Amino acid sequence: MANVIVIGAQWGDEGKGKITDLLSRSADVVVRYQGGVNAGHTIVVKGQTFKLHLIPSGILYPDTECMIGCGTVIDPQVLIKELDQLESLNISTKNLLISETAHVTMPYHRLIDKASEERRGSHKIGTTGRGIGPTYADKSERTGIRVLDLMDPAALRDQLEWTINNKNVILEKLYNLPPLDTEEVIQEYIGYAERLRPHVVDTSLKIYDAIQRRRNILFEGAQGTLLDLDHGTYPYVTSSNPVAGGACVGTGLGPTMIDRVIGVSKAYTTRVGEGPFPTELHGELGELLCDRGAEFGTTTGRKRRCGWFDAVIGRYAVRINGMDCMAITKLDVLDELEEIQVCIAYEIDGDRCDHFPTSARQFARCRPIYKTVPGWQVPTSECRTLEDLPQQALDYLKFLAELMEVPIAIVSLGASRDQTIIVEDPIHGPKRALLHPDGTPASLLSA
């Protein structure tokens, strides 16, 4: 039995969906623990592409139980569309369970999110406009609607009559928007409740029962470490906690029950939206990475900013999450490059800095210190073992593992399930220490 957390080690979009999908083969339960429809994951199976925002990747395995935990915020409209899409493809959704204490995104959340971002002008933070921040804000203010409220028409009406009256004042007076029709919203969400009712349970109890039965549980985060509300590049962050610790709060998992943490990073770095990005590439190289990596957001379609691999934020992610091993994705995107650069440290105002600065203003002043390594200029997308990889690609992966001081367990070379090298099964394989007894960093070559 293993309880495994999969987290993003960069700014999201690292390929967690594919890695979670792969690991779901060995999992009995897959749990999404935070975020909402502001994140998406793409999975390619036998040439068929699935784009999901709320439903865990494990849904594609008929015997895997999938849960949406209490730390998520649920947009019923989007969730029902995902259910309908999967069922139209003859993929069963009977194993999907939804936390009754998760909060619900309402129409006023989306309206306020978009209007607030517009009002920020040059100070915008790059929100997706899906209402996630305002939903979490209402949760903190204790005025939110939870799934269990959605299941009780009388309670829902009582809460929404008061809440929409207050939100309409904000919409009209602050943003010059027309008010919402209270009765229309109530009836719309009562309809959603009936569609979702069979899936709603106390997921924390289900998770505890699964642990008692010694089942393998995979906890799936959205976004990435550098977008964490407390540990990311604030204020250019999301409104929840994608880090490994968020899995405990967002599901009811006790911290002593975590067996291992798997971090997912691209072989380079991307970021979508606003905020500092020291290794960002402009010009032809940035465009090359964007084109070869198909770097456009699953949720918004926005073009992602691309740059070299940043080992400073990588080490930070290892530390914050207590990572046991890494999955490196999109190695094949680098196939055409003669040389590759890796950021090993920063320079701030003339001084070397080996650690991630907690101030976004200070982070914006960071200039990357690069180590240049040779590329391989050989296609790797058909490689299926470490021995198939060109030596320069192996050397690159070993270099990343040494810089991060954590072993690499998985290498992804494309979007499909089969375009993967499993160095070590992170669920059933032996848990390795970050350093060997002789003090040298562990690397994928020690597998």
UniProtKB/Swiss-Prot annotation:
The keyword Magnesium applies. It catalyses: IMP + L-aspartate + GTP = N(6)-(1,2-dicarboxyethyl)-AMP + GDP + phosphate + 2 H(+). One of its GO terms (biological process) is IMP metabolic process. This is Adenylosuccinate synthetase. SMART domains: Adenylsucc_synt (SM00788). It comes from the Bacteria. Keywords: Cytoplasm, GTP-binding, Ligase, Magnesium, Metal-binding, Nucleotide-binding, Purine biosynthesis. The gene is purA. Transmembrane segments: none annotated. Pathway: Purine metabolism; AMP biosynthesis via de novo pathway; AMP from IMP: step 1/2. PANTHER family: ADENYLOSUCCINATE SYNTHETASE. Homodimer. The active site is at 13 (proton acceptor), 41 (proton donor). IMP binds at residues 13-16, 38-41, 128, 142, 223, 238, 302. It comes from Nostoc sp. (strain PCC 7120 / SAG 25.82 / UTEX 2576).
